[in-house]
Amino acid sequence: MKATAVSTRKMKTMSAGELEAIEQEALRNYEEIKSRGMSLNMSRGVPCVEQLDLALGVLEALHARSEFANSNGDDCRNYGVWNGLLEMREIFSELLGVPADQIILGNNSSLQMMFDTISQGFTHGCGGHTPWCRQGEVKFLCPSPGYDRHFAVTEYFGIKMLPVPMLPTGPDMDMIEELCKDPSVKGCWCVPKYSNPTGVTYSDETVRRFARLHPAAPDFRIMWDNAYCVHDLTDEPAELLNIYDECVKEGTEDQVIIFASTSKISFPGAGVAALASSAKTIASLKGRTTVQTIGSDKLNQLRHVLFLHDADGVKSLMKGHRQILAPKFRIVLDALERELGGLGIARWSNPKGGYFVCLDVLEGCAKRVVGLCREAGVTLTDAGATYPYGNDPHDSNIRI
């Protein structure tokens, strides 16, 4: 704990006696914290009750005397409309920068749509190519630290995951371009804005280099999970270049698939998910989607349309989320600076949006830190979870 005069210096410059004094004080503080009997779960980015209450109007948008038809005359209570309500697709079109007729709506989970997309590539192939399961060992690029649930999907299918370091500009594109020369590399996971957990937003050049990729594998897919596209925390939000437009310029639009949802906009358990891509890729996905379902939850889509109206309505709602979230980020960042600033034993992100602060402690210490937090009643994401196979090679990264 940063409580003594000597602790304003980097710890590596301190004497053994100074370090021992800090250790003893830290242990006393730790035992006091343990005695409080706390039970605090910070393992996932879960919206609080106050955030969920911001979208209660979704539940009030429909009632027994409502008009249940959309602008095309489709009765939203019935079967049909395989790709989802046009009005909801138009909202996502504004947010994602892809034409509405190149968007498929799902139910509440974009992760499920990602899983289904990987599953289709594995069992039936991408774009008419041989299914991945018949090509021997296939591989996926995994910018790391990254999203553990992405890695869980590729691990589930036995796809070999290749970690790629995250830089301040996004994934190491030199490495990605080199690895893509291998035809067994079939795709790359991406969280391009306020990346989970680093908070990095991909630079314009990184987005353009993704668009310029010409992988050896013709069935390579960029899984572009734009989960935090409107989740800004400051007056100067990060700007993300539209990858679809860049891919169109390069003639590579078939290989990018964009995902998003209203999970952290309205309700995580009852929102609307979306998938966007080129007309050709959407047509190939339609073949599977129309076998899988006769249509997603149109009543929920209609509720969201009536509540949100358009992309401006989404952005207005997100201001309420910011008012609740930004002070919480400030509490965490102030505590890190107060307790660890200047000691040379940790570094952390200061994101402009998203849901996470990324903390790097000294090499070999992350598991121990997370374990000590657990003993004190604070549950964090497991150390290592932000890397493929749960293996942080440095045992240093912690997602807060």
Task: List PLM regions with ranges.
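PLP-dependent enzyme catalytic core of the Aspartate aminotransferase-like
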Residues: M1-K2, A16-I22, F68, G80-W82, ...
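N-terminal "arm"/small-domain region of PLP-dependent enzymes with the aminotransferase-like
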Residues: K2-N83, S93-E94, E375-V378
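Conserved C-terminal alpha-helix-loop-beta "cap" of PLP-dependent enzymes
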Residues: E23-K34, T281-I282, K286-G287, Q292, ...
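Short, solvent-exposed loop/turn segments at secondary-structure junctions
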Residues: G45-V49, S110-L111, G146-D148, T169, ...
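Hydrophobic "anchor" residues on beta-strands that sit immediately upstream
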Residues: G187, R221-I222, I257
